[in-house]
Amino acid sequence: VRHRKTALIWSLLFLAGLMAGFWMLNPAEPSYQGRSVSAWLDDIPMPKNSTAAHAALKAIGSNAAPSIIRRLRQSESPLQTKYRELFPRLPPQLAKLLPQPKAEFRYFDGAGAFLDIGPGVEPILIHSLKDRSLSVRVATASALGSLRFFDGADIRDAIPGLTEALHDESKMVRLHAALALGFTGPEAASSVPALIPLLNDSEIQPGNSGRIFVRAAAAGALGKIGPKAKAALPLLRSLLAEKDIYLRVVTAVAIWRIDADVTNTLPVLIDGLTQIDENSRWEVYEGMAEMGPRAKAAVPLLVSQLGLPPTPVNSYNSQKITNALQQIDPEAAAKAAMK
């Protein structure tokens, strides 16, 4: 036991020394309120400190991007991972002498940090889609899609890079690239040949560590591209026979948007109203709203879902349901509003 404890202590000291040297090699960084970008990035994963950290990155602007990329690369370091793993096992006296391990900086932390910079970060994100680091590639693809929330943002310049990212070895990169392309709509028609094969993606992570919904993301993107994605219809129609109701629903909406087919898609959407998670039903409501009077068979179920207990999700869904009813059957919408 003593031998193992001694080995653990020496291992920690060695790791701490390596990491100290690693951090000292970092180039000089911009600062804000006397703190470097890296110091602010340390606070991003910490709920109590993240608000101030995001405000600081917004103030620093594009000059913070190199540090964000560097931090994402460092997050993949086996040294950091091992140090975080071993530190809690140290004797308290020794732990006081060593630096606290840095909180894990995940891809969504990096994506949020990029978004603090705003639309001006787009050229950096496009370039970083080819970065050697998986964390950087996932974060940049995710951030590019989320730029749609910014006034004046236009990610059409990213379409070629995002299309190439559909071939990335990582399912997470493929997922976020497909989502981002969907937000560009018909402008992404050139990506259709690269999106179609993703409808057959295995979606299972290596080692069965979870499922990545690449097929649904690809189907959604093809639907948002619209009639220019007609080449995808044969494969999309085959997905309507899948067991996964969420995939069937997203596919049904996509087919409707590409081909205006109500006959084969509305029954799937009606099934989805009761079978998929409430957090995902908004996609069903949007599809039915687009169908208008042709979705009249769904009116009774839509009206019944207006009466669900009030929660943040149900309140959001109620707005979507009300809009769908107004598009499908204004008279039914008016009656439902009076209840």
In which residue ranges do the predicted regions lie?
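Short, Lys/Arg-rich N-terminal segment immediately upstream of the first membrane anchor
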Residues: 1-4
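Surface-exposed, flexible loop/turn segments at secondary-structure boundaries
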Residues: 76, 203, 278, 310
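Hydrophobic membrane-insertion alpha-helices, especially the h-region
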Residues: 8-23
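Structural detector for internal amphipathic alpha-helices that build alpha-solenoid repeat scaffolds
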Residues: 22-31, 42-60, 83-119, 127, ...
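Acidic helix-start/capping segments at beta-turn-to-alpha-helix junctions
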Residues: 70-74, 82-86
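Amphipathic alpha-helical scaffolding segments comprising HEAT/armadillo-like alpha-solenoid repeats
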Residues: 34-41, 62-73, 119-130, 152-167, ...
